[in-house]
Amino acid sequence: MKPLELDVFLCRTDNFGVLVHDPETGFTAAIDAPEEAPILEAATRRGWKITHIFTTHHHTDHVAANLALKEQFGCEIIGPINEAIAIPGLDRTMADGDSFLFGDHTVKVIETPGHTAGHICYHFVDDKLLFAADTLFALGCGRLFERPAADMWHSLQKLAVLPDETAVYFGHEYTLSNARFALTVDPDNERLKSRAAEIEALRAEGKFTVPTTLGLEKETNPFLRAADPAIRRHLIMEGKTNEEVFAEIRKRKDNF
């Protein structure tokens, strides 16, 4: 089985567009469809025909180009069953634990409510790829628009059990701000300090910070580390639940 090919590019202001191409079948999936023109440019540049859109959630900056791409390519749009009514052009719904084949590549659906009520992530199991959209960012997580903090914490735990070497592709280039915030709640984390310096250098050169790995996030992302004693001490929350610590970190990030 030939490895998947990926193309990552910017859409809108800070959205990542991602095309996933299976060279054996010619299938190409857009992970969300934030903006038509950059997606078409990437597909044309690579000589790929878009056959699928894998929608993660209903926000406009993730579905804006669904109908235009469907009209041009006749692509199949897959998305979360719990947001079906809000996703333009949806053909097939997916629930937590569902799986399907993209060529010979198994894709498992993980429902991660928090940012929205029905947000899903796509895990390419054998390829060790996770498309986490607005649930898990590099050094961050999505804002909580439709579900409470406890729900997002439990959603993140569903992702945290995946293999450490899993490559994580996320929805926005927010990493520099996330790194600066992370240092305010986990200031003694040496791995975080070195990573923040790396991110400052990458962004100064205009380079993307995607992908990250799940193992790196577990070492440095405060939103996955609410149980960490050092963070709890810094926040003076030693006796609180993981959900309460996570909620405090999220509140601080909202006001950062």
Swiss-Prot record:
Keyword Metal-binding in annotation: yes
Keywords: Hydrolase, Metal-binding, Zinc
Main enzyme class: hydrolase
EC number(s) per entry: 3.1.2.6
Organism domain of life: Bacteria
Annotated residues for binding of Zn(2+) 1: H57, H59, H115, D134
Reactions the enzyme catalyzes: an S-(2-hydroxyacyl)glutathione + H2O = a 2-hydroxy carboxylate + glutathione + H(+)
Known pathway: Secondary metabolite metabolism; methylglyoxal degradation; (R)-lactate from methylglyoxal: step 2/2
GO term, biological process aspect, one: methylglyoxal catabolic process to D-lactate via S-lactoyl-glutathione
Cofactor(s) the protein needs: Zn(2+)
Entry binding sites for Zn(2+) 2: D61, H62, D134, H172
SMART domains in the cross-refs: Lactamase_B
InterPro entries in alphabetical order: Clx_II_MBL, Glyoxalase_II_hydrolase, HAGH_C, Hydroxyacylglutathione_Hdrlase, Metallo-B-lactamas, RibonucZ/Hydroxyglut_hydro
Cofactor binding description: Binds 2 Zn(2+) ions per subunit.
Single Gene Ontology MF annotation: metal ion binding
Subunit relationships: Monomer.
Family stated for the protein in its record: Belongs to the metallo-beta-lactamase superfamily. Glyoxalase II family.
PANTHER family in the record: HYDROXYACYLGLUTATHIONE HYDROLASE, HYDROXYACYLGLUTATHIONE HYDROLASE GLOB
Xref: HAMAP family: Glyoxalase_2
Role, per record: Thiolesterase that catalyzes the hydrolysis of S-D-lactoyl-glutathione to form glutathione and D-lactic acid.
Record's protein name: Hydroxyacylglutathione hydrolase
Source species of the chain: Rhizobium etli (strain ATCC 51251 / DSM 11541 / JCM 21823 / NBRC 15573 / CFN 42)
